[in-house]
From Swiss-Prot:
Pathway: Amino-acid biosynthesis; L-arginine biosynthesis; L-arginine from L-ornithine and carbamoyl phosphate: step 3/3. GO terms for cellular component: cytosol. This is Argininosuccinate lyase. The keyword Iron does not apply. Residues 1-17 have a biased composition (Polar residues). PROSITE patterns: FUMARATE_LYASES. The lineage of its organism: Bacteria, Pseudomonadati, Pseudomonadota, Betaproteobacteria, Rhodocyclales. Its main location: cytoplasm.
């Protein structure tokens, strides 16, 4: 999610305040080490989730009689004030307090006294941060799922409007067969539908509560983890304390789903870039998604799709970073895991921003239908239809394939497309394949038209305009 945390003073104090853990040590941490090990620079964006988790924990402690009712009231009052300070940009984030957790706890203690010191009873920063990350990531996934839906709705509108707009379908970037632009766009709907399913499935594993696992072995206090899970909207608790505080597979899974989504959008971006080039001339993008050149006044560059391609590498890199981070860690928690947040945050930010832009950009595509159709006059796009025609007339497919290949070669020599041959010319081109020429009749010319080719693919998943419209309607039903 885009970081909206107010800026704050993150400098270290000239004094050496006592750390939450300093009693064990005989000398203070050096300023260099403080800066190297602190995470408050980036984990303060989880402040809202940290407060939510702490309030649920405090309610449980009071409910179990571990802290008093007045302690709970003081904690709730202090947290409300802290939340307001953060939202107004008035909270003083301090490097000396290392991370979001201790910064908030120290401020709470300053506001409410001993009640603030009692808040950490029965928990560790290990299970606290694992809970914060899951809360934050759950929010991010919900936002991403909504944005995928926005993108898909706009994509369906463009696909419906172009359900019968013919264009070349490509394999190996060579003209293959006629399809419609709407059918082509619906391929990306299906890709992002699977992406949404992956995020929704990942959310199930994110939505498990680590809190109560403490440092690694659980706690001796009579806590009620199920109560906290209900308070925070988790489906269940994590059932092994070692696993709960130490693994980040849920974050890796999220980054993997993000990499797949970005890969799909990168492929789409590559096509938009190609289609916008004068060599294709299939579409134009709205000016607000393009930039010019500082030296070439005629240029209109598709910078947004190009950056989507580039940022896909960035998201893939974050996935590799997290996999590498986890691969060598013994159980349980290690400081290595502090490095999980920046790749995770950056991945979510990139995906969210990309989806927001794409949902708008898709509505600004101007389709150049004449150019799309004109491209079908090159590359013998209906050659397969001619082969299928011969097969339906009784010729074995391999013989039909050979006969049509000979016809294409003859068309290349003549410099024309297959529909420009007369019936006799087509028969002559296929004469070397026994039985092929005899199968041809005047009805072949209806088969060789673009419309004939498109209409013949009239089955579920096919490119016939009627099927594209049906696919759009079905997709809208699934979206709700």
């Amino acid at each position: 999610m885009t970081d909206t945390t107010p800026s704050a003073d993150l400098g270290a104090s000239s004094q050496q305040p006592a750390k939450a853990w300093s009693g064990r040590f005989s000398e203070p941490v050096s300023d260099l080490v403080k800066r190297y090990t602190a995470s408050v620079f980036f984990d303060n964006r989880m402040a809202e989730q940290d407060i939510r988790g702490s309030l649920a924990h405090a309610k449980m402690l009071a409910r179990q009689g571990i802290i008093g009712a007045q302690d709970l009231a003081d904690i709730e009052r202090g947290m409300a004030q802290i939340k307001g300070e953060i939202e107004r940009g008035e909270f003083n984030w301090n490097l000396d307090d290392e991370d979001v957790h201790l910064n908030i706890e120290k401020r709470l203690t300053a506001l409410v006294g001993d009640a603030g010191k009692r808040l950490h009873t029965g928990r560790s920063r290990n299970d606290q941060v694992a809970t914060d990350i899951r809360l934050w990531l759950r929010d991010a996934i919900d936002q991403i799922l909504a944005l995928i839906g926005d993108f898909q709705k706009n994509l369906l509108d463009v696909a419906e409007a172009n359900a019968a707009t013919p264009m070349p379908g490509f394999t190996h970037l060579q003209v293959a067969q006629p399809v419609t632009f709407g059918h082509h766009l619906m391929a990306y709907f299906e890709m992002t539908r699977r992406d949404a399913e992956r995020f929704a499935d990942c959310r199930k594993r994110v939505n498990r509560l680590p809190l109560g696992s403490a440092a690694l072995a659980g706690t001796s206090y009579p806590i009620d983890r199920e109560f906290v899970a209900r308070e925070l909207g988790f489906d269940e608790v994590c059932y092994n304390s070692l696993d709960a505080v130490s693994d980040r597979d849920f974050a890796i899974e999220f980054c993997a789903a993000s990499s797949l989504l970005m890969t799909h959008l990168s492929r789409f971006s590559e096509e938009l870039i190609l289609w916008m080039s004068p060599r294709f001339g299939f579409i134009d993008l709205a000016d607000r998604f393009c930039t010019g050149s500082s030296i070439m006044p005629q240029k209109k560059n598709p910078d947004v799709p190009e950056l989507v391609r580039g940022k896909t590498g960035r998201v893939n890199g974050s996935l590799i970073a997290l996999l590498t981070l986890m691969k060598g860690q013994p159980l349980a928690y290690n400081k290595d895991n502090q490095e999980d947040k920046e790749p995770l945050f950056d991945t979510a930010d990139t995906v969210i921003d990309t989806l927001r832009i794409y949902a708008d950009m898709i509505t600004g595509i101007r389709v150049k239908a004449d150019n799309m159709r004109g491209a079908l006059t090159q590359g013998y796009a209906t050659a397969t239809d001619l082969a299928d025609y011969l097969v339906k007339k009784g010729l074995p497919f391999r013989d039909a394939h050979e006969a049509v290949a000979l016809a294409v070669r003859a068309a290349e020599v003549r410099g024309c497309d297959l529909p420009q041959f007369s019936l006799d010319e087509l028969r002559a081109a296929m004469a070397h394949v026994p039985g092929a020429a005899d199968k041809l009749a005047d009805d072949i010319f209806g088969v060789l038209t673009v419309e004939g080719s498109l209409d013949s693919r009239n089955h579920i998943g096919g490119t016939a305009p009627a099927q594209v419209l049906a696919a759009v309607a079905h997709a809208r039903t699934r979206l709700g």
